[in-house]
Regions:
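Pre-DFG segment of protein kinase catalytic domains
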Residues: 142, 159-162
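An alpha-helical support segment within catalytic cores of ATP-dependent transferases
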Residues: 1-7, 108-145, 149-150, 155, ...
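Active-site activation/catalytic loop segments of kinase-like enzymes and analogous catalytic loops
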Residues: 173-201, 214-226
């Protein structure tokens, strides 16, 4: 039914083994191309997601988005080959830091994500984390906000997939999510941050720790809501 597939013979359509929580993912093969079809399970601002993925594609860090069908609740984009990793070596960390820096340079006009409003937990630990953050300037950039290993593809390059949570927020939130998701030890964390930040930029470890606390709490809240 889509012009995208006119004059293309569909050879295969299959449900992918690796599935996300927010979408059903299908691989569609034509005679000369492979596509990812994402059937939405949850409500999100999909127009914003499509726009952000296009901006990220322009920076060579995402699959090319091809079609958004809000009526049928699906998005089609180019299929990316790559490997998911749960453990990162120095080369991976360096590449990931550079791609993240690239993402954070993208200009987007949007209403920023309010982390405090997003969290239902008002635990002492969470409150203390937000008190710490009040001491620091908010460095608002376009963040992916869901950098778990299943959303990062490694080949010669690094690319991100599943952009539904992407929005403007402090860049330390993405940095914290990488540190948490890959369980980086002190040495790996220092190496990662050293390749993300410019030499003239100060690294605020206290701010990073506060964002780790908030990220973990948001993950817990999200999984409990499923």
């Amino acid at each position: 039914q889509y012009k995208l597939f006119e004059n293309h013979e569909i050879e295969e359509l299959r449900l992918l083994k690796n599935q996300g929580y927010c979408n059903e993912n299908y691989l569609l093969k034509s005679e000369d191309k492979q596509y990812l079809i994402r059937k939405f399970k949850l409500q999100h601002d999909r127009k914003l997601e499509f726009k952000i993925q296009q901006l990220a594609y322009d920076k060579n860090i995402a699959a090319k988005p091809l079609l958004l069908d809000e009526v049928n609740g699906l998005m089609i984009c180019e299929f990316l080959e790559g490997k998911h990793k749960s453990v990162l070596d120095e080369d991976d960390l360096q590449k990931l830091a550079q791609v993240l820096r690239n993402l954070h340079s993208i200009h987007l006009k949007s209403k920023p994500l309010n982390l405090k409003n997003a969290l239902s937990s008002k635990s002492k630990e969470i409150q203390e984390a937000f008190v710490i953050l009040e001491k620091y300037e908010v460095e608002e950039v376009l963040c992916h906000n869901d950098l778990n290993p299943q959303n990062i593809l490694f080949t010669d390059e690094v690319k991100f997939i599943d952009w539904e949570f992407a929005n403007l927020v402090d860049r330390y939130f993405d940095l914290a999510s990488v540190c948490v998701e890959f369980d980086l030890d002190n040495q790996a964390e220092k190496y990662f941050l050293a390749h993300y930040f410019n030499t003239d930029e100060e690294i605020y470890n206290e701010k990073l720790t506060a964002h780790k606390t908030i990220y973990k709490a948001l993950c817990t809240q999200w999984f409990e809501s499923l």
